[in-house]
Regions:
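Gram-negative bacterial Sec-dependent N-terminal signal peptides
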Residues: 2-20
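Metal-dependent peptidase/peptidase-like ectodomains
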Residues: 105, 136, 217-283, 331, ...
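Second-shell loop/turn segments in exported
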Residues: 30-38, 52-61, 130-135, 169-176, ...
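Soluble metallo-hydrolase cores and metallopeptidase-like ectodomains found primarily
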Residues: 122-157, 232-350, 364, 368-372
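A conserved hydrophobic secondary-structure block that centers on an alpha-helix together
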Residues: 147-214, 329, 333, 345, ...
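C-terminal amphipathic alpha-helical interaction region
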Residues: 653-748
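Noncatalytic luminal/extracellular "stalk/propeptide" segments of secretory-pathway proteins
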Residues: 23-30, 37, 49-164, 169, ...
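Alpha-helical metal-binding/catalytic segments enriched in His/Glu/Asp
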Residues: 200, 322, 338-392, 397, ...
Length: 748
């Protein structure tokens, strides 16, 4: 899955001014130069071609073969490595049926057709058919209703037009929110089945030429995926909070709250167009219209009836996590953890293997450094996860199985996933924002010869001038001043989730992209070696660049003699989040008042076309005033403590004794765990982080200050008030730890 944040660089001199670890900078540069000598795009191409040569879904022979090959390479390069096996619930289809039964019978679905020039697209004997994991088996027939993206606002639009999905089958298009929310919301509204299709407006011919002429999604392509309720908890649905070992105590399927109850299947836009072309009912509003050559209707009038059936094998399947370690010389019990998964939905060349082979390049280079006599100060742990695609299974089970040890030893988790051509993107824990920017300034962009940081900054400036997409005002202001661009916040959708949001380790997610066309074949049979090397990253030049970026992060974090964090960046970011939450509350109050006034005045009734009636919005509870004083005070304290610590380290860091440095390293290793609340978030206690979480109705997308923000959005006003206090407490605790660390710097 792809990164979706932004960053740019800053000068090395700024690092020194901030007190960021400058342990023998000449030696560091020499080590990084030696590291770069061992990074080879040719290696990555050879590994990628082999690893993507056959279907490698969880439980497939090639998935296991890839894990064993990765293990052998780690050992060849001098790592202490092993495979840790978990036994995870992984349903696979026994049979799938989707067909229109009225107004005429048309059989739909089936395996994706081969494409000339893409050799692997014809190797389907061992490939699973298009399906989604963790849907509810069933055999249903019902009238079809089009629900746009199938998000909460879409159901409000349907209700205003008098359309009810109860007892019906819905068809939703991919996009806007995470796929698993679409059938979950359909189920919550009484639907008996759900179809999800990829509209060409979002990743097909409306975006680029369709594959194989271009890289966009062709008419027969189907996006697979998981539809379990990941915003409730990721990992094995049967073992929440514990590792899915062979003898683990498991829930029954009926007890597992993340499993759906209704059948769900994905569909190509070639097939979806046949359904939508025959659908009647009201014409869909403009925002609902995609790029198919049909008039988009909402249905609900009994014009189209669909038969949908899924039967699955609900078995436990082995997942093979490859774990490799280089032991630290000074701080062996402080771990810098690096991960990327190796399982795909079919061939998985872009997602995940383009990122995995970049990680393997790093591991090879680090192994060569180790053989030549270099030893990291901290232990480096490299992980190649299995079973990420179904629901972050491999990484989550390992995190849950080793939770106590990880809380005691984990210093940071660095993640990559699919990689492509374009700008560097990053999300993560904001104390590491400056470090990421500094590393980006030291790596050359392979297409332009500029630094990765300079290109990212230029991209922000040019996009803002051209009004291309959403403009991040914070990033724009930073780019205009030549400063650090902000990290994005981490939601979910890749293997960092358990580490930051459940265990409280700081985390980063890094990748290149924006100029590749991997979105067009995402989770399909066409995510292939041919597609990657033709449209996504020819020659894997950006694979090598990713290795150099992440390798530097690992090296600097492993060898840092002084803290690399800038806590002022974190404090400023939290202050900005609080400003957003306050604005959200004020905007909601104003919107509620306007809605109630227009309803009372009959404006919606008078504005509605009598021949195409649209009712007034349903009444909702008025958003009240909130007392944010506790959070205001906590953020003020955090900013003061962060500024004081950063300033003290900049002034005195170089003169600290080794004993002071060791004490600082211990004090700050687990500081991010103070941002957890063991009671967790409302209705989903697995997620414990009170600054970053995946949204309940966004999935992959992050919600910051989630306990407060989501409660306001969902009109759980009592929860909002409670989490003002709970969030304030974790911020005060965090500030107090910074004060203790400053005392160490000052020799107190």
């Amino acid at each position: 899955m792809r990164a979706a944040g932004i960053l740019a660089g800053a000068a090395l001199a700024a690092m020194a001014a901030a007190g960021v670890a400058q342990t023998a900078p000449t030696d560091r540069k020499a080590i990084e130069a030696r590291f770069d000598q061992h990074i080879s795009s040719a290696d990555q191409l050879a590994w990628l071609k082999d690893m993507s040569s056959a279907p490698n879904h969880v439980g497939s022979p090639h998935d296991k073969a890839n894990a064993e090959a990765i293990l052998a390479r780690f050992r060849q390069w001098g790592w202490d490595a092993h495979i840790e096996t978990f036994h995870v619930l992984y349903p696979t289809p026994i049979s799938t049926t989707v067909e229109m039964v009225a107004p005429e019978k048309i059989v739909l679905g089936g395996q994706e057709p081969p494409i000339p020039g893409d050799d692997t697209s014809s190797r389907t004997a061992d490939a699973l058919p298009p399906y989604v994991a963790f849907q509810g088996d069933g055999d249903v027939t019902g009238d079809l209703v089009y629900v746009n993206y199938g998000m909460p606002e879409d159901y409000k639009d349907l209700a205003r037009r008098g359309i009810d999905v109860k007892g019906k089958i819905v068809i939703a298009r991919y996009g806007t929110g995470w796929r698993g929310l679409k059938p979950k919301l359909a189920q919550d509204h009484g639907a008996i089945g759900c179809i999800i299709y990829s509209d060409p407006a979002d990743d097909g011919y409306a975006q680029s030429d369709a594959y194989p002429v271009g890289g966009a999604r062709p008419a027969g392509s189907v996006q697979r995926g998981s539809v379990a309720d990941m915003p409730l908890y990721p990992g094995d649905p049967l073992t929440p909070g514990i590792g899915a070992t062979l003898n683990a105590k498991r829930l029954t399927r009926e007890e597992a709250p993340t499993l759906l109850k209704i059948p769900v299947l994905p569909m190509s836009y070639g097939d979806a167009g046949k359904l939508l072309a025959r659908l009647g009912g009201p014409v869909a509003p403009a925002p609902w219209r995609g790029a198919l050559p049909v008039t988009y209707h909402m249905g609900g009038n009994g014009g189209v009836s669909v038969h949908l059936a899924v039967k699955s094998n609900w078995k436990l399947t082995p997942a093979y996590d490859v774990i490799a370690m280089l032991k630290g010389a000074r701080y062996p019990d402080q771990w810098v953890i690096r991960g990327n998964h190796h399982d795909g939905w079919v061939f998985g060349a872009a997602d995940p293997l383009s990122g995995n082979v970049a990680m393997l390049s790093e591991a090879k280079a680090l192994g060569e450094l180790y053989r030549s006599g270099w030893r990291p100060a901290r232990t480096i742990v490299y992980t190649s996860w299995d079973a990420e695609e179904p629901m972050l299974l491999g990484s989550t089970e390992w995190a849950e199985q080793h939770a106590d040890e990880l809380k005691q030893k984990g210093a940071i988790y660095i993640n990559t996933d699919g990689n492509g051509r374009g700008m560097l993107h990053a999300q993560g824990s904001h104390p590491f924002q400056h470090l990421v920017n500094a590393v980006a300034a030291d790596v050359t962009d392979p297409e332009t010869g500029a630094s990765v940081a300079a290109r990212a900054r230029a991209g922000v400036l040019a996009d803002a001038f051209d009004r291309t997409g959403h403009v991040n005002e914070t990033a724009l202001a930073a780019a205009e001043k030549g400063g650090d661009l902000p990290l994005g916040a981490l939601g979910s959708g890749s293997d960092y989730s358990a580490y930051i949001q459940h265990l409280g380790l700081p985390a980063l997610n890094i990748g290149f992209g924006g100029e590749d066309e991997s979105d067009g074949v995402y989770h399909s049979i066409y995510d292939s070696f041919h597609h990657v090397t033709t449209f996504d990253d020819p020659g894997l030049k950006y694979g090598a660049a990713l290795s150099k970026v992440v390798g530097r992060l690992v090296l600097r974090l492993a060898d840092a003699d002084l803290p690399v964090q800038r806590y002022g960046d974190f404090a400023d970011t939290v202050a900005a989040y609080l400003g957003e939450v306050k604005k959200l509350a004020a905007d909601r109050r104003a919107e509620d008042a306007k809605r109630d006034r227009l309803t009372a005045d009959g404006a919606f009734r008078l504005a509605s076309d009598p021949l195409k009636p649209v009712g007034a919005p349903a009444p909702e509870a008025m958003t009240p005033e909130f007392d944010f004083a506790a959070l205001d005070g906590a953020v003020k304290t955090l900013r003061q403590s962060a500024a004081a610590f950063d300033g003290a380290l900049a002034a005195r860091g170089a003169a600290l004794s080794q004993a002071q440095r060791d004490r600082l390293s211990v004090q700050l290793r687990d500081i991010d765990q103070l941002l957890l609340d063991d009671r967790g978030l409302p209705e989903r206690p697995w997620y414990k982080h009170l600054i970053y979480a995946p949204g309940r109705f966004t999935g992959y997308g992050a919600k910051t200050l989630p306990g407060v923000r989501e409660a306001i959005e969902e009109r759980r006003f009592g929860d909002a008030r409670e989490f003002v206090g709970r969030t304030a407490k974790v911020l005060r605790d965090y500030a107090a730890r910074l004060d203790q660390a400053r005392a160490t710097v000052e020799g107190k």
